[in-house]
Amino acid sequence: MGKDFFFYRLYVYSNIMKIGLVMNVKLLKNLAFLGLLSFSVFPSFALSKIIPDGTIPYNMGVQLKGDTDGPEDLDRVQELGMKWVRRGFIWESIEREKGVYDFSQYDRFVNDCEKRGLKIIGCMAFSNKLYGHVKDEPARSAYADFAAELVKHYKGRNIIWEIWNEPNTMTFWGRHGKVGNSPQYAREYTDLVRAAVPAMKKANPDCVILAGSVSNMWSESYKWMSYCFADGMLDIHWDIWSVHPYGVKAPEDYMEAYSHTRNLMKKAGGDTGRLWINSERGFPLGKAEGYAGGDPSLAYEYQAWHVIRQYLVDLLEGLPVTIWYEWGGKEGFAL
């Protein structure tokens, strides 16, 4: 019953999205009337062309991976009503020989997305064994070169570029430190952003760059962001700060988490009106009991509720894009 069950769930999610969008429209109208809702101001023309201004449903998307990015999956994503996809652009798969870049496998994906009107968050990941870890030279400069080649090659396409995935964690930044969310990890990541952003802007002045990609919204990740801000992160000319709001049981709790993060930026002397994106948030079906909360037998219902509630929260908080993790896969998060 695999395919039939998928389309049944697709039908259910489509109706959930429709219900949620109606709720959003009514809620947004009421809040706008009350003067409680503030819309983002775009800092550049290039940014305003690709990032929606809060128009429903043009700011909802889903995470894809290499085994779920084919035409059939993209057709289903489009049918569900999503307008964005997030996917890794893996450095090692593009630069297998120093200084030689092969974009062919990603060209197909970008073209397929473009045909379906899907915009892309391209996560530029990870270190390359040709150079070593990006915390050190020459890998840091080589990553900046790779990022510059990416934005040059895909200039004019509907892609925004995220520097790394969850660099505050040992899982994705490395186990050379004793613990994640450390001052060391913050300093190393800030140095990478400091190297990559000027190279990218030189190669393509109109490219849109996301920094942060922060995993979880809790005390330790707040500390990590503060370390980044203290190291000069807010002085670098990236365009959008991206977060992955995991760590609490109810999406509504992220309103307080977002507020706290804005206060951290303000305390560090940063622009609290700078754009944000939720570039990853999911609900684990296989772990419904625990940090996600809820009865495992109701996992699918809880996941559906979380999709809509997270989307509503992000809209209310002025986040112009929400990416749901994930479309498929075996981690237990798949829609």
Model-derived regions, located:
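Bacterial N-terminal signal peptides that target proteins for export
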Residues: 21-32
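Bacterial N-terminal signal peptides
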Residues: 32-41
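Boundary/entry segment of secreted carbohydrate-active catalytic domains
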Residues: 47-83, 88-90
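Structural recognition of the beta-strand scaffold that forms the well-ordered cores
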Residues: 59-64, 83-89, 120-124, 159-163, ...
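Substrate-binding cleft and catalytic face of glycoside hydrolase catalytic domains
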Residues: 73-76, 80-234, 245-248
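Aromatic-lined carbohydrate-recognition surfaces of secreted/lumenal glycan-active proteins
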Residues: 192-222, 268-286, 319-329
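Substrate-binding cleft/loops of secretory-pathway carbohydrate-active enzymes
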Residues: 214-242, 284-294, 298, 331-334
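Aromatic/acidic polysaccharide-binding cleft in carbohydrate-active enzymes
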Residues: 282-335
